[in-house]
Amino acid sequence: MGRVSFNVRVSSVRRARCSCPGRCYLSCRVPPTTALHALNGFGRAGVLGETAGGTVGLGPSGTRGFLSGSKFQASGSLKDCFGAPPAPDVLRADSSVGEGCPQKLVTANLLRFLLLVLIPCICALIVLLAILLSFVGTLKKVYFKSNDSEPLVTDGEVRVPGVIHVNRYENTGAPSMPPSQSIPAWTPRAPSLEDQSHGNTSTCVNITHRQCQILPYHSTLAPLLPIVKNMDTEKFLKFFTYLHRLGCYQHILLFGCSLAFPKCIVDGDDRHGLLPCRSFCEAAKEGCESVLGMVNSSWPDSLRCSQFRYHTENNSDASRICFSLQQEHGKQSLCGGGESFLCTSGLCISKKLQCNGYNDCDDWSDEAHCNCSEDLFHCGTGKCLHHSLVCDGYDDCGDLSDEQNCDCNLTKEHRCGDGRCIAAEWVCDGDHDCVDKSDEVNCSCPSQGLVECRSGQCIPSTFQCDGDEDCKDGSDEENCSDRPTPCPGGDRGCLDSSCVESCAGSSLCDSDSSLSNCSHCEPITLELCMNLPYNLTHYPNYLGHRTQKEASISWESALFPALVQTNCYKYLMFFACTILVPKCDVNTGQRVPPCRLLCEHSKERCESVLGIVGLQWPEDTDCSQFPEQSSDNQTCLLPNEDVEECSPSHFKCRSGRCVLGSRRCDGQADCDDDSDEENCGCKERDLWECPLNKQCLKHTLICDGFPDCSDSMDEKNCSFCQDDELECANHECVPRDLWCDGWTDCSDSSDEWGCVTLSKNGNSSSFLTVHRSARDHHVCADGWQETLSQLACRQMGLGEPSVTELVQGQEGQQWLRLHSSWENLNGSTLQELLVHRRSCPSGSEISLLCTKQDCGRRPAARMNKRILGGRTSRPGRWPWQCSLQSEPSGHICGCVLIAKKWVLTVAHCFEGREDADVWKVVFGINNLDHPSGFMQTRFVKTILLHPRYSRAVVDYDISVVELSDDINETSYVRPVCLPSPREFLEPDTYCYITGWGHMGNKMPFKLQEGEVRIIPLEQCQSYFDMKTITNRMICAGYESGTVDSCMIDSGGPLVCERPGGQWTLFGLTSWGSVCFSKVLGPGVYSNVSYFVDWIERQIYIQTFLQKKSQG
């Protein structure tokens, strides 16, 4: 039980009990407005307001006590407490708090506040489970038949059966309401299920609900439990879905499904349904009640196990009395038949995933009873390995069982405490490769490739003189001769050697200046924080972001809006914005911090929300760095009571609740008053409607050159070109005669795309064809040379020409012939060297075959190798992996080599850093901090971001990078293959992700790899409320949380192996959960297949086309 603050006079403080079942605010001055109404038939709980004098008074409806009206509302909502307008929360210690202005509080007020916070609060700190359900945002409205009666209230208690109760305490400060004269049918006094007849003459129906396909039967009757009868099935099952994700009981979802869809039993003309057995209920209650206990709740009374029957009653057939786990029929039945496999963890997976060498169950139970052939090693996890992978220093089994009790060659290897042998070069390299960390004992900093602080602490060399004090004694920022003057006002953002966007247009900036000299204010452009009481900010912010662009794609910019809709703290969004876009003092040009009290309240009330889903409060938001509001020498920010709670990224319900904007008009009511699902037509929302699938588009997406409708109707009828003109991809018109002439006339260069192709006739010959003036022309062979064949093959993105033949052409063909002085034209494209002619003197045309460029090969990799769960990768296994680096920051993002001069990465890596001169790309390295003999470095020449990249939804997150020079292709540096356009991966395909990323709180020096399974987009969307999953994205991971995506950095590859050992790039690590988990879902990758045309087009334009000279 924690300490909380009150905003009432001491004389009026009473031992009040929270009225809203399931959750209380930290302040008991106002009962909670965000309580859990899951699975319970209760109405809208009112709130005890505060009178002007500070005493406990009437609720919003004027009713004294705990109900918001004299009559129980039958259409109670799962989100009623969530949806009610939050009462003013306690933050101020004085009435002078105001409008985001700097606050300086006097000692008397502070003493008053300290006195008040010592008063013990009777309410629970927070109902974590309620917040979790709200966090995912799926709590819906629930309807109950209450016979128009009120819930029974006696002795200061609201006796509402079926409620997930919090601890009850006597309320001596408010009169009790009179008992209700009629008792709702769903109270404990209502007839129990044992007394009710299950007979039914209705027809059995098939179970179609996707989640409940795990049931071992396929037909059901109408729900039997009163609570299920009067509640939408989807809403009922949400409660069990989240308990399932918390892993409290492996069959909790099965239990919920058996309640929602009771088994239909046919007995002659009679039909009756089977509810779960009492033992099943007791097992579910035993497993999950402890989770509910964490939030001061208990197993719902409406699901009390005493109402269910024993399977041994009357010594009759148990299968016709109640539904049990039926272990005697095998576990398979619990997952819906022979097509599924039931993991020990309770997860149901496709049977085809069993015994495939992958940890799909998260507990290896799908691999536990698999047989290995005699020539293979059987891992403790059940996996089968080639014996050459045993005792090689790499964890191939996933549990290190292949590396136990090995005979180490002590001249070349180090023996870990568990018997594992690792390479000698891994000793003192900065990574803990031994489980017991014995490989990093008694190591000097230089031996690990690190720099030693004065205190003896080791840090990477790139951390020196970077503006951040990484050494605890600050010695890494001393004697920095090339460092500019210190940042004013304690700013810790002297992170870049050149002025960034925040300094653009400032007279303080020049080519030699630094962020430390940029002290002016800039307008707030971060959408989340556009409704603040101030409109100027100063960077870097308090989370270390150097620009607003960087802040907009940060994890925190997604975290805080998601937390806002949990109602964990009224002023959370205000606090978030004060650290994301700090207020800029126009007089000093310095940041104005939030007050420490605001930070502490935000953290106290919302940190536990993150804890239940395995996340931590952002570590950079240490409240001790912010001043007390009573400080005499520094001002700080506190919010006004009427500060806007909803950010521009939220939709504000009529009730005042904030829901994510992405959930507006999504077909499911998230507002307690359903206002988010009103006026949802495209025209009503001023959007354009696709004719085929009725998809709504912003008008800015119409006729922009990128099809968005499934039938591309948004790009039709966009321009009206003359008969002698052709339409560019961006709907400009150019003269027909200029099409494919080697000079770009369309502003998007589309008049020069795909001009050279190979076409087949009846035989096997491939004829060279040029699409001039919108007509295909054959190329006359007169004067042809091999260098022209090479140019043609390169222009089509192929390898060297293998065959060039002169073949007799046909009568009536359209001909192009070489320009008489083509050798002097210095042309970069084939079409530029050709001119239109009516005939070809020889009558021969060019037949050409080009080789395919070799890609996706790994000559240095050891084959037959699988690594799970994020293990260190062997050198040479991923020769296309590269590191995108900048000075002085070092490694920033991963990248992928796709051609000798071209790499791919994600667009958001360049947010605020789009100058190619500050970047370089490093190839052929496994350990970032140790140079390799295979390493190659190239500077960046050109950065091409996708024009439709949106940082708001991180869509179209891809960029093409041109290198200054070609790489030298070796066994350790080679390009990966690109997929065919629109070649999509099937669900349950296994692929690899690689990168350096982060593991825990440190970045590993060695390249990491892990296997992930492709997850359907519709399933993926269910994990993400803040973002919309589009077909430009791929979802991959494990629902069970096997692979840790913390290890993978942005821009790293997702590659899949084709038959024959060739690897193809299908994804680039873009965004997703901070780490894979049951609650947070998979990682999201840019779908390379969708962008292949665009990628090849950019390479073609940069390589071959030249802009038509003006004038």
From Swiss-Prot:
Which GO BP annotation is one of this protein's? peptide hormone processing
* Keyword Transmembrane helix appears in the UniProt entry: yes
Give residue ranges on the Cytoplasmic side: 1-112
Q: Spell out where the chain is glycosylated.
A: 147, 296, 409, 535, 763
The places in or outside the cell where this protein is found are:
Cell membrane; Cytoplasmic vesicle
Tissue specificity = Specifically expressed in heart. Also detected in kidney, aorta, brain and testis. In kidney, present in epithelial cells, with segmental expression in the proximal tubule, thick ascending limb, connecting tubule, and throughout the collecting duct (at protein level).
Query: PTM comment for this protein?
Result: N-glycosylated; required for processing and activation.
Q: Which effect does the record note for changing residue 1087 to S?
A: Prevents proteolytic processing and activation
Q: According to the UniProt topology, which residue ranges lie Extracellular? A: 134-1111
- Any single Pfam family the record assigns to this protein: Trypsin
Membrane protein topology class: Single-pass type II membrane protein
> Could you tell me which residue ranges the LDL-receptor class A domain spans?
334-371, 371-407, 407-444, 444-481, 645-681, 681-719, 720-756
Residue ranges annotated for the SRCR domain, each copy included: 756-851
Q: In the Enzyme Commission scheme, what number(s) does this protein have? A: 3.4.21.-
Q: What region holds the FZ domain? A: 199-325, 516-639
**Matching Gene3D superfamilies:** Frizzled cysteine-rich domain, Low-density Lipoprotein Receptor, Trypsin-like serine proteases
| SS bond list | 204-264, 212-257, 248-288, 277-322, 281-305, 335-348, 343-361, 355-370, 372-384, 379-397, 391-406, 408-421, 416-434, 428-443, 445-458, 453-471, 465-480, 521-584, 529-577, 568-606, 595-636, 599-623, 646-658, 653-671, 665-680, 682-696, 690-709, 703-718, 721-733, 728-746, 740-755, 855-977, 893-909, 991-1056, 1020-1035
Provide any one GO MF term from the record.
Answer: endopeptidase activity
Q: What SMART domains is this protein classified in?
A: FRI, LDLa, SR, Tryp_SPc
Q: Which UniProt keywords apply?
A: Cell membrane, Cytoplasmic vesicle, Disulfide bond, Glycoprotein, Hydrolase, Membrane, Protease, Repeat, Secreted, Serine protease, Signal-anchor, Transmembrane, Transmembrane helix, Zymogen
Q: What is its main location?
A: membrane
What sort of enzyme, by top EC class, is this? Answer: hydrolase
Q: Where is this motif: DDNN motif?
A: 93-96
| Recorded family membership | Belongs to the peptidase S1 family.
Write the protein's name.
Atrial natriuretic peptide-converting enzyme
